[in-house]
A protein has these predicted regions:
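C-terminal structured domain segments across diverse proteins
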Residues: 149, 188, 209, 213-223
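C-terminal substrate-binding subdomain of Rossmann-fold SDR/epimerase-dehydratase oxidoreductases
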Residues: 31-38, 64, 195, 215-360
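Residue-level recognition of oxygen-bearing side chains
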Residues: 71, 102, 109, 207, ...
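N-terminal Rossmann-like NAD(P)+-binding domain of SDR-like oxidoreductases, especially those catalyzing
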Residues: 1-193, 349-354
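Glycine-/small-residue-rich active-site loops that bind phosphorylated ligands and cofactors
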Residues: 67, 92, 103, 198, ...
């Protein structure tokens, strides 16, 4: 499990630190005493977690494009990190239909650039490559996908994440092979999570942010696909897994250099309709929703992960049930509306998670 003392003084480089997941990861690692540098485009939304929780006060922050190889390599070389989390991405399915070139250049070539920089700079012990559960070839069957399933992806976003996994696999085989770990000393793992939700997400075309925007403006929530099932989980759930993977890569890179799934309990893979109904109840007065009957680009209807390997080999398990998570999201958002100090509020959220010892 997470070892807070391990992170004290560790030099950690994070791409995509201005994003939703990147902001939460930066805050968590800072709380454990890590020395951080982030490399990313400006925060993708306004407002954003990065700004509302003052994440920039916790770390060195460089604004740069993952597609600019020279700038990225120089940024890494000047910081001399021990551990890298690669989160920078174009993360939206529907945007990938409109901007496929940007999606592939960011998600695929961005990964190539990051791993080539690691190879050239040297001195890095652990690289955690964050992709997505959508990297798998989705057969829309009832079983969870295991780490050795085929990569795929129907839409440009999902396919780009499958490609990013293949890039990581090729670099691992060619340059960071576990069998040759004694010579190169680099542990490289890929981590895959489902639909991550939590306070501080204002992205377009995501269910929870769309719901909260509508509630905040006293508008009905318009739902596209009420029967779609997603593996919903609080953002701290997979991040805790990524952190544990990094710890293990650092101490035994050869053993843990592979793919890892991080998803919720099976009973928390719920429909969109379940989510919006719960959110309506939690928000209270004035909240409601309606069905949008228009045609929309294809989105997979069912995809879940088999996380048995993470359970058995990492001791990782989810801590917060979906209903607990939804309640925390509403409270976080209302605290922001009411002008609370969201850095301190978010620190307390992490503390609550760290001190949850049984599933709640």
């Amino acid at each position: 499990m997470i070892d807070k003392s391990f992170w004290q003084g560790k030099r950690v480089f994070i791409t995509g630190h201005t994003g939703f997941k990147g902001g939460w990861l930066s805050l968590w690692l800072s709380e454990m005493g890590a020395t951080l540098k982030g490399y990313s485009l400006d925060a993708p939304t306004s407002p954003s977690l990065f700004d509302t929780a003052s994440i920039s006060s916790l770390m060195e922050s460089e604004i740069g494009d993952i597609r600019d190889f020279e700038k990225l390599r120089n940024s890494i070389a000047s910081f001399k990190p021990e551990i890298i989390f690669h989160m920078a991405a174009q993360p939206l399915v529907r945007l990938s239909y409109k901007e496929p070139i940007e999606t592939y250049s960011t998600n695929v070539m961005g990964t190539v650039h990051l791993l080539e920089a690691v190879k050239q700079v040297g001195g890095i012990k652990a690289v955690v490559n964050i992709t997505s559960d959508k990297c798998y070839e989705n057969r829309e069957w009832v079983w969870g996908y295991r780490e050795n399933e085929a990569m795929g992806g129907y839409d440009p976003y999902s396919n780009s994440k499958g490609c990013a996994e293949l890039v990581a696999s090729a670099f691992r085989s060619s340059f960071f092979n576990p069998r040759d770990y004694a010579n190169h000393g680099v542990g490289l793992a890929s981590v895959r999570a489902g639909n991550v939700i939590g306070g501080g997400d204002w992205a377009e075309d995501r269910l929870i942010p769309d719901i909260l925007r509508s509630f905040e403006n006293n508008q009905q929530v318009v739902i596209r696909n009420p029967h779609s099932i997603r593996p919903w989980q609080h953002v701290l759930e997979p991040l805790s897994g990524y952190i544990v993977v990094a710890q293990n890569l650092y101490t035994d890179g050869a053993k843990y250099s592979e793919g890892w799934n991080f998803g919720p309990r099976e009973e928390d893979a719920k429909t969109v309709e379940f989510i919006v109904d719960k959110m309506v109840t939690l928000w209270g007065e004035g909240a409601s929703w309606l069905l949008d009957g228009q045609n929309h680009p294809h989105e997979a209807h069912y995809l879940k992960l088999d996380c048995s390997k993470a359970h058995m080999q990492l001791g990782w398990h989810p801590r917060w049930a979906l209903v607990e998570t939804l309640g925390r999201i509403v409270k976080w958002h209302k605290a922001w509306i009411n002008g609370s100090d969201m850095l301190e509020y978010s620190k307390r959220e992490i503390h609550d998670y760290m001190t949850t010892t049984t599933f709640s």
